[in-house]
Amino acid sequence: MLRQAVLFSMAAMLGSTINPAHSDQTNPGEPSKARKIYLEYCFSCHEFGVNGAPAPGDKEAWDTRLSQGREVLLRNTIFGMPPVMPPRGLCEACTDSDLEVVLDFMIHGAGGA
């Protein structure tokens, strides 16, 4: 049991050093990848509401935005919302699918560090 705990801890530490935009994971929808992208590119604005950025899990803020349609949110994520939201959240290596997964991750409140 102790050996498993040590191995799990080591795997978690190694996983935290992976650059999410260059990960070799085959499943882009994996929550851990979304979390890594969120922490590297989205956290600094969205966690603290910089320039009105909706925080992960802020149901009221996300519901207001979702009323425009999820497609609009994804388009805004991809192309940005000048002057406050840069295109792709500055994650140039992120695919549209990566951004869609991170968007869902934030809407459902899994982004908190």
Model-derived regions: residue spans:
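The canonical Cys-X-X-Cys-His
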Residues: Y41-F48, V102, M106
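Gly/Gly-Pro-rich "capping" loops immediately C-terminal to redox-active cysteine motifs
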Residues: H46-R75
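C-terminal segment of classical bacterial N-terminal signal peptides
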Residues: M13-P20
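Bacterial N-terminal signal peptides that target proteins for export
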Residues: M1-L7
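Axial heme c-ligation environment in periplasmic c-type cytochrome domains
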Residues: A55, N76-E100, M106-A113
